[in-house]
């Protein structure tokens, strides 16, 4: 196998992984989505921020709870509900414009919330936060992931993938 073939295969793998991740992504409060109903400008919205309950208000349908649903599932829900007396054959597209932020604290130079980017690893998240302080441990990293009802604490490494809503804490190292 040539170097060129290996590079092409690697690029395809990365692209397919990020596409799969986007398809599996579950919406929650703080996400910003766009809804496009083809041919229906009054039902198309370029930017909707999900409220604290993970919901948004939509014409004719009222409050739509998107929390825990994938963008594809929200498309199907809106399509089904618009077919019920409003449109004959609605074509709906839902896409994520901005993911909810992740949070990083502890021994980083600039702790706080940062915008999530698909494929973000912990080492890149640390770089976004200005890098590690002099006292930081690159081995004592905890990551809290999950919803309000079920939160999991994970011992993380620098190659761990970060997800939207994650809370990362970098502990001090022992010298």
Task: Show where each model-derived region lies.
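N-terminal signal peptide c-region/cleavage motif recognized by signal peptidases
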Residues: 16-18
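Short, linear, compositionally biased motifs with a strong N-terminal bias
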Residues: 12-13
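Ser/Thr/Pro/Gly-biased, low-complexity, turn-/loop-rich segments
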Residues: 2, 20-175
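Bacterial N-terminal signal peptides that target proteins for export
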Residues: 1-8
């Amino acid at each position: 196998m040539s170097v060129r073939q290996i590079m092409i295969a690697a690029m395809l793998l990365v692209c397919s992984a990020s596409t799969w991740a986007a398809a599996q992504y579950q919406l929650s409060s703080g996400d910003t989505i766009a809804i496009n109903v083809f041919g229906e400008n009054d039902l198309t919205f370029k930017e909707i921020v999900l409220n604290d309950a993970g919901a948004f208000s939509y014409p004719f349908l009222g409050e739509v709870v998107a929390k825990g649903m994938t963008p594809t599932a929200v498309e199907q829900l809106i399509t089904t509900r618009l077919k019920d007396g409003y449109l004959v054959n609605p074509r709906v597209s839902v896409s994520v414009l901005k993911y909810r932020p992740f949070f990083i604290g502890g021994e980083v130079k600039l702790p706080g919330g940062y915008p999530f980017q698909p494929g973000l690893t912990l080492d890149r998240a640390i770089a976004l936060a200005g890098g590690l302080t002099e006292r930081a441990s690159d081995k004592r990293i905890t990551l809290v992931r999950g919803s309000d009802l079920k939160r999991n604490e994970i011992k993380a490494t620098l190659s761990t993938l970060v997800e939207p809503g994650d809370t990362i804490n970098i502990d001090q190292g022992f010298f």
